[in-house]
Amino acid sequence: MAIVSSSAGRADSQPPAAKSRVVDASPLPEEASPAREDGLRPKRLEDYIGQRELKQVLGIAVKAAMGRGDALDHVLLYGPPGLGKTTMAMVLAEELGVKCRVTSAPALERPRDIVGLLVNLQPREVLFIDEIHRLTRVAEELLYPAMEDRRLDLTVGKGSTARTRALELPPFTLVGATTRAGALSSPLRDRFGLIQRLEFYGLEDLQAIVERAAGLLRLQLTAQACQEIARRCRGTPRIANRLLRRVRDVASVCGGESLIDAALVDEALTLHRVDARGLDASDRRLLDLLLESHGGGPVGLETLAAALGEDPATLEAVVEPFLLQLGFLQRTPRGRVVTGAGRRHLGWPELP
């Protein structure tokens, strides 16, 4: 039960924002809108490339719900940013033949914000909440009966005049997306019937995504050019599409070539300082500092952050994860260490 007149702050604090990077998986300001002008988002499950197990599970759930004439069960999608959680929510709505109402947890700071969304839902509609781990406690309490019993419990008034009012809600589907599934409270997480993780994409799927996006942008790329973009996008479709747009910019300025080849892709992405493995200037600065000034480590996080002029939380949350994923960096009790693979990539000899 929740009090309508209550207000509360945001549920958690976020790490300081890093400088804008072309290989950042988080959406840039111009990419924040779910509906972009270039229309690169797939609209149906059959157009959604990759995530085969996820598509199979959700496809069966959609067909079953439509067969019953009921709303799809509530869905929680989690995983790293840029893998298609928002897109999947919109695809589910399209498959169900209903609207998808899109919002994010920080926009639902006041109880009346989420109440307004819930009472205006039409039968079987999809409500998508991004960053759902950032919901306030009051917003979560409003969602509990809404998700479980399709009912909104409101307390109107204060003190001795307070009274409880229950509003019946139509059947609806809540799709929550988060990069931090562990930050969700257990009561909220337990109310989702389908909890699915999105994985990083393989090279073959990424190449298919680049080919599809190139067609929608009316670009002609060789297979090698598509593969070159796929190699550098960190397993993330959002980054792949962003790199493709940067390649388009260079191609149009360099004479508007009708066919974009791998050499032009390399030229364009080298201009943006993205190397053959997807590392950018920030990644290489960290590795270079460790190698040139500290013999490859170990070096503490605070020391690295001070030397690089970065916030420690930003360094740990934004720069390091991809280096760890590639096996170029290792976290040890004594600090950060460049691995043999990291040394080879930067052209340094391995330690004996």
UniProtKB/Swiss-Prot annotation:
Cited SUPFAM superfamilies: P-loop containing nucleoside triphosphate hydrolases (SSF52540), Winged helix' DNA-binding domain (SSF46785)
UniProt binding sites for ATP: L40, R41, G82, K85, T86, T87, R191, Y201, R238
Gene: ruvB
Comp. bias intervals (Basic and acidic residues): 33-42
PANTHER family the UniProt entry points to: HOLLIDAY JUNCTION BRANCH MIGRATION COMPLEX SUBUNIT RUVB (PTHR42848:SF1), PTHR42848
Known EC number: 3.6.4.-
Domain notes per entry: Has 3 domains, the large (RuvB-L) and small ATPase (RuvB-S) domains and the C-terminal head (RuvB-H) domain. The head domain binds DNA, while the ATPase domains jointly bind ATP, ADP or are empty depending on the state of the subunit in the translocation cycle. During a single DNA translocation step the structure of each domain remains the same, but their relative positions change.
Assembly, per entry: Homohexamer. Forms an RuvA(8)-RuvB(12)-Holliday junction (HJ) complex. HJ DNA is sandwiched between 2 RuvA tetramers; dsDNA enters through RuvA and exits via RuvB. An RuvB hexamer assembles on each DNA strand where it exits the tetramer. Each RuvB hexamer is contacted by two RuvA subunits (via domain III) on 2 adjacent RuvB subunits; this complex drives branch migration. In the full resolvosome a probable DNA-RuvA(4)-RuvB(12)-RuvC(2) complex forms which resolves the HJ.
Any one biological process term the GO annotation gives: DNA repair
One GO cellular component, as annotated: cytoplasm
Protein name in UniProt: Holliday junction branch migration complex subunit RuvB
Record keywords: ATP-binding, Cytoplasm, DNA damage, DNA recombination, DNA repair, DNA-binding, Hydrolase, Nucleotide-binding
Binding annotation for DNA: R331, R336
Positions of region (Head domain (RuvB-H)): 276-352
Region (Disordered): 1-42
